[in-house]
């Protein structure tokens, strides 16, 4: 009997989750397949890649134009949220990475004498993706098996219940500042 694969089979799409825009790109690859029945070129959504803290792009997906943005760094996330709230921008899909450059630039990464290597690391993730024989999340045999044996099909009731979440606004907790005054935190 073959050994278990405790970490599973990875796809190139999974690898690029560590770079800003990677989660979006992986999702768009599979969304294109689900919408059209055929895979796009794996690099069709490369326009969203890069080190810029706020990237925008438009893609045609199944005859519709999809407006997307990917931001990294909390300052850029704040700018994006404010622009959305003020109606300055409109997107169909947004990715936010807290760390500049995505997880490749996160606090758990080694620091090289103060050099910022997130862009270089992100580039390496895309090289690993390009070399992977499985470039699409939906082609991962373990993901396919999970759907066949348990979830049913993408967007099935069970898959939706277990894999999707909804978000509604919540009131931020009260805080006490250095003068002892209580204040409410709220997005301005």
Annotate each language-model stretch with its function:
Residues 1-188:
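Iron-sulfur (Fe-S) cluster-binding modules
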């Amino acid at each position: 009997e073959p050994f278990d694969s405790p970490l599973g089979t990875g796809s190139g799409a999974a690898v690029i989750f560590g770079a800003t825009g990677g989660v979006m790109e992986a999702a768009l690859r599979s969304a294109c397949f689900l919408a059209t029945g055929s895979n796009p070129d794996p690099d069709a959504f490369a326009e969203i890649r890069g080190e810029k803290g706020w990237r925008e792009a438009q893609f045609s997906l199944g005859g519709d134009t999809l407006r997307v943005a990917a931001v990294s760094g909390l300052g850029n996330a704040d700018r994006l949220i404010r622009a959305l709230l003020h109606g300055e921008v409109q997107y169909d899909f947004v990715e936010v990475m807290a760390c500049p450059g995505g997880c490749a630039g996160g606090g758990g990464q080694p620091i090289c004498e103060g050099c910022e290597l997130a862009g270089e690391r992100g580039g390496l993730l895309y090289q690993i993706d390009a070399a992977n024989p499985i470039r699409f999340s939906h082609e991962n045999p373990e993901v396919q098996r999970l759907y066949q044996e348990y979830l049913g099909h993408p967007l099935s009731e069970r898959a939706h219940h277990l894999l999707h979440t909804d978000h509604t606004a919540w009131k931020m907790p009260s805080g006490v500042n250095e003068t002892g005054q209580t204040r409410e935190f709220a997005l301005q």
